[in-house]
Amino acid sequence: MLQPPDEHAHADVAVEAWWWWAASADGSQGAFVGFELRGRRFDYWAGFVRAGEPYLYIEELDGTGLRDGLEIKPPEMWADHVCDVAFQQWSLGNEAHGVLLDDPEEAWRRAHGTVVPVTFDIEWYASGEPTEIAHGYEQRGEVDAQIELTEGIVAFTGPASRVHVWGVPFMPSSFAMPVATTGLRAPYRRNDGTRIDQVLTDRWWANVIGPAVS
């Protein structure tokens, strides 16, 4: 049975991962945040997609600068992930420089794009009880999100989901590339070069594993 301490880091595991996904009510924009902890080192990803706009991508792989809880302060950025009420509410934030990618697949390579300052301020609220999965749990919710860009603040509310696993990294279950030809793409790369493709479709976020970057 899940207990409130399960929301936080487990000291006896080699790896632990927290992931959140969100979309606006009309599906025209969405965001994600991923955080994977390995001892005192970590990987961090965040992204924001909008119809007709470049993909905004943030990554910090094999980072250092872990503070108390799930707060991180590597060079040139800050992020925090705060459990306000166990299984009910999380607060996610960052202050970083992201890259705007006209070609989302550039995130699989060197992520060359236009560098821009960005701030995420996301409140995640549960809309149901967590469901146990292998090595952790998943949960549905909703968000109140504000993404601050150079042109101003983009705000949206809408459905959300999250996953928390420990003892293993979070990896999508499929090894086939997405068949969706429409949607907002938000791919990312893991620190071992594995490509993960994510697409915000009219049904929800889909994410699958692709081949490692050569």
Which sequence ranges carry the predicted segments?
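Targeting-peptide/extracellular-domain and disordered-appendage signature
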Residues: 1-214
